Amino acid sequence: MLVFAGLGNPGAKYADNRHNVGFMAADAIARRHSFSPWSKKFQGLIAEGTIAGEKIILIKPQTFMNLSGQSVGEALRFYKLELSALTVFYDEIDLAEGKLRIKTGGGAGGHNGIRSIDGHIGNAYRRVRIGVGHPGIKEMVQHHVLGDFAKADREWLDPLLDAIADNAAMIVKGDESGFMNKAALAVQGKAIAELEKPAQKQQPKQQSHIRQARSQQAPAKLPETGPMAAMLKKLFGNKD
């Protein structure tokens, strides 16, 4: 049995935040592998399923990010699992958008969710760091991670989440380099496809059928002789 934990903050107002990309990864895995419905347990939401023949417990702590360790620690103690059975998915500002890295152990890197988990159970577990980019200045970090992904971000975020879900079996089997390669190829492939799209020709603005009919008609020719011609000359004068 393995535990996959996706980190984030509970509630609709945080759902699309960069800080919640761990929740998004957990949701993508649950959908892709037809996990059980989410249920409340261990101060979080859990779903159960099987990947590559291994039973997986997905957990999304509902304690808010800074207390994630309470939920994750409770789950590991309940199932009597070692730290090596845990994989945590979370946002990483020190990675460019769309980049993904895996490592086991190490420091929290300023991430409060990871700091909480380290404090409760230790740090010898696998981390899947999902790059969300850095705002450039330290004072803007909180605003950045608690801000929503922009519409343009879906160009790399959606293929990355799909790749995480599609290739989760590689994590189960311990093929970390293969998993990172698949994720990178998915994001690069999407970017290349966008660049190779033929430029769309600008369509002429639609005109009403009346204007179209008018534009197709030859300009009316004014009469040069007769009563009508005489009347027009009185109205507008003789242009000769």
UniProtKB/Swiss-Prot annotation:
Site (Stabilizes the basic form of H active site to accept a proton): 91
UniProt subcellular location: Cytoplasm
Entry-linked SUPFAM superfamilies: Peptidyl-tRNA hydrolase-like
Binding site for tRNA: 14, 64, 66, 112
Annotated region (Disordered), positions in chain: 196-227
Active site: 19 (proton acceptor)
GO molecular function terms attached to this record: peptidyl-tRNA hydrolase activity; tRNA binding
Pfam family, one: Pept_tRNA_hydro
GO biological processes: protein quality control for misfolded or incompletely synthesized proteins; rescue of stalled ribosome
Residues annotated as site: Discriminates between blocked and unblocked aminoacyl-tRNA: 9
Keywords recorded for this protein, A-Z: Cytoplasm, Hydrolase, RNA-binding, tRNA-binding
GO cellular component: cytoplasm
Enzyme Commission number, as recorded: 3.1.1.29
Reactions catalysed, as given in the entry: an N-acyl-L-alpha-aminoacyl-tRNA + H2O = an N-acyl-L-amino acid + a tRNA + H(+)
EC class (word): hydrolase
Family membership: Belongs to the PTH family.
Complex and partners: Monomer.
Name by which UniProt lists this protein: Peptidyl-tRNA hydrolase
Encoding gene (name): pth
